[in-house]
Regions:
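A noncatalytic interaction/capping subdomain that flanks phosphate/NTP-handling catalytic cores
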Residues: 1-176, 186-194, 201-307
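Conserved glycine(s) of the Walker
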Residues: 178-180
């Protein structure tokens, strides 16, 4: 993982252009000239220089605003203090607030209905003392991709994803504390194993193949990779005194996946698509509960079950 932020080449005369690849999507940013923009260390591996000169799947214009205020209308969804979403026929507007900056939003973003074009406004007064900033800092990057996925593109899940020596792609799901980071550390000690993320994985179906994508949003093990791999098997983690792999029914697997999915629950069409996507996924990929103890032979238990 990079040890420090990567500064974007903004100058007083020219805006900054950069592109990222996350979850199979290209994200392009045009930052207002002179803006002290940087990439968070977690995002540096996701830089995509090959996309800089072309049109990206999601394009953002980033600029300053002298002031920002919340709308009078009630939001369609409020996270409980960090962000809120307001929808109308022109698209979706997000407002980001923090006690650090008072009641006024420190950032706002408008996305068109297809979540392919957006405009991000940064409240200049909130960033006066900042030498650098990342315009798409979490949770905005995840929010935008979560909404784009819900338009028929895939789903983000609370999971660890990895690729074994034989190219088998394993997905381990669990809420916080279920053992994703512990499982990640067990597999990290195995030669030839590639980890995609220890906390958030994007799932998509492309050319008839279900694929996993790593994301920048890692867990305690600090694993984040832009890599992708076909999905071979799904395991729901449960900590136990010993190892046991227990196949589960397709309806139960779909329900367990939905409980660990990130999606805009206030968008009916997004819920309907996600349910359909997970139903089809669990009819195609074997799903099991993995009861395990945090010992190295847990790895062999998975390999034996998938053999």
């Amino acid at each position: 993982m990079p040890e420090r932020n990567t500064k974007l080449p903004t100058t007083a005369a020219e805006p900054a252009r950069l592109a990222l690849q996350i979850g199979g999507f290209s994200l392009g940013l045009w930052c207002e000239k002179g803006m002290p923009a940087v990439l968070d260390p977690e995002h540096v591996p996701f830089l995509s220089p090959s996309d800089v000169n072309g049109a990206c799947d999601l394009e953002f214009d980033i600029s300053w605003a002298s002031a920002l205020s919340l709308p009078d209308a009630a939001p369609d969804f409020a996270s409980g203090g960090l962000w809120s979403a307001h929808r109308d026929n022109t698209g979706t507007k997000f407002y980001f607030t923090s006690p650090v900056f008072g009641s006024e939003p420190y950032k706002a973003a408008w996305l068109d209905p297809s979540f392919s074009r957006g405009h991000v406004l940064l409240n200049r007064s909130s960033f006066q003392s900042h030498d650098s900033l990342f315009p798409l800092e979490y949770p905005m990057d995840e929010l935008v991709l979560m909404h784009r996925l819900a338009l028929g593109e895939g789903v983000e899940v609370h999971a660890l994803g990895l690729v074994d020596q034989d190219s088998s792609g394993y997905l381990f799901l669990g809420h916080s504390g279920a053992g994703k980071s512990t499982t990640a550390r067990l597999w990290m000690r195995q030669p030839g194993v590639r980890l995609l993320s220890d906390d958030r994985i994007i799932l998509r179906r492309q050319n008839g193949v279900y694929r996993m994508y790593g994301t920048p949003w890692h867990g305690d093990a600090g694993v984040s990779s832009p890599a992708t791999a076909p999905l071979s098997a799904i395991f729901f983690l449960e900590q136990a005194p010993s190892h046991q792999v227990v196949p589960i029914s397709q309806p139960q697997a779909a329900a367990e996946l939905f409980a660990r999915a990130f999606l805009p629950h206030y968008v009916k069409s997004g819920i309907e698509f996600t349910l359909q996507f997970l139903d089809q996924l669990t009819r195609s990929i074997p799903c099991s509960i993995f009861r395990f103890a945090p010992t190295d032979d847990a790895v062999e238990a998975i390999r034996h079950a998938h053999a």
